[in-house]
Amino acid sequence: MSRLFQKEDDIVALATPFFSSALCVIRSSGVSAIEKFSTMFSDPSKLLEASGHTIHYGYILDNETKEKLDEVVVCLYRAPKSFTGQDSIEVMAHGSLIGIRRIIDFFLKVGFRMAEPGEFTLRSFLAGKLDLTKAEAINELISAKTRQVHALAVNKLSGSLFDKIDLIKKDILNFLSAISVYLDYETDDNEVVIPVDIILKSKSELERLIDSYDTARKLENGVTLVLAGSVNVGKSSLFNLLLKEDRAIVSSYAGTTRDYIQASFEFDGILFNVFDTAGLRETSDFVEQLGIVRSNSLIKEASLIFYVVDLSGKLTDDDLKFIDAYKEDSRVLFVLNKVDLEQNNQTVEFFNSNDIVSLNTVKISTKTLFGINSLYDRIRSFIAVDYMKTSDYDIVISSTRQAALLKRAYALIIELLSKIEQNISYDMLAFDVYEVVNVLGEITGEVTSDDVLNNMFKNFCLGK
């Protein structure tokens, strides 16, 4: 059996990142956590006699040499009023790397073992302190990279998803109660009125939750934005402008960027993974050729493409090929750069021509910042279509596990409706209803297995 389920063990882990900092938090829990920790605290009797939810100042001591390891503040919790439902100690110490190692070594020396990833949260779940939807929300909250994802995780942590699943489950059980009447009493089938509206409502609620999953995945993965174009048109300048920092080398020499550069930024609460790619051109340089191949591959996979054109120069053959290939692609915005310079008449006339005027374009100058607000407005228009739909949903599903179970429950509901149309016997309908309820119970953790829990919590970070 996995050590995750050895609930009687006293466990310890660093709950904050392992790097030098002003403070760190070392978390411990277990049936003997307070007694064991007291042997390494400067005033053991104070801890042993203390009530829960109290804070104590003192020192971590080597219980053999009495050497002081660190000056600490200790938060003490007594079962069952703690996150794990067990006695727990949280130590706030100085964030010295050597100090952290020495303190944890002493925890191990007095009988604690290192916690497995997610073990504290698992113990909280097993103690009935939270359901699986809240446990997963904690993990989502920790890993959130943008305000939108963070807000969605907080919403689920407050119990919104559990409440929604519980409501659907109660509706389905009400349907079961209604058809149970016909199981208990003989009734003329012609007089039977099955409350199909209850099942249709549940079907609609499940559809809505399942639909929200695609939006959630897009929010978590972010927008893949590729900056493409010929050499020396200002892609790297635009890259730096979007990031608001100098990440890419800007040079008047063509071919400065020979491979892509990747970075991330947040815009209106949405994560953008932006790629500054090698300029598209014919070249004999093998390394640059590889960079161009990668550029073309990124373009094909991109969510959004900014094709940068130099309005002060002539359009290249590569520009014309790209425009012809992507002129009807809604992912592409043609960014007409360098409007601060004397413009090339042929290039300007090309984009003003009737054949090409329908192209999605915006004029900017990365040097003077002309048109940048217009560019930002175009970005907002793009993300409004697929990435700002969270307002359409009261709850958004982002867990692959939850989405898979919701799809199973939905398939069972469809099957149930089909059997109702076929006038299948009530006892068979009751069996199907119980199956739906069990699947919904797997989402919240009311029905689950050790294997499922082990697989889920191993993806948590240490100390959580």
UniProtKB/Swiss-Prot annotation:
Pfam families: MMR_HSR1, MnmE_helical, TrmE_N. Binds 1 potassium ion per subunit. It comes from the Bacteria. Its cofactor is K(+). Keywords: Cytoplasm, GTP-binding, Hydrolase, Magnesium, Metal-binding, Nucleotide-binding, Potassium, tRNA processing. GO terms for biological process: tRNA methylation; tRNA wobble uridine modification. It is found in: Cytoplasm. GTP binds at residues 232-237, 251-257, 276-279. One of its GO terms (cellular component) is cytosol. Mg(2+) binds at residues 236, 257. Its main location: cytoplasm. One of its GO terms (molecular function) is GTP binding. Its EC number is 3.6.-.-. Coiled coil: none annotated. NCBIfam families: mnmE_trmE_thdF, small_GTP. Belongs to the TRAFAC class TrmE-Era-EngA-EngB-Septin-like GTPase superfamily. TrmE GTPase family. HAMAP family: GTPase_MnmE. This is tRNA modification GTPase MnmE. It comes from Borrelia recurrentis (strain A1). The lineage of its organism: Bacteria, Pseudomonadati, Spirochaetota, Spirochaetia, Spirochaetales.
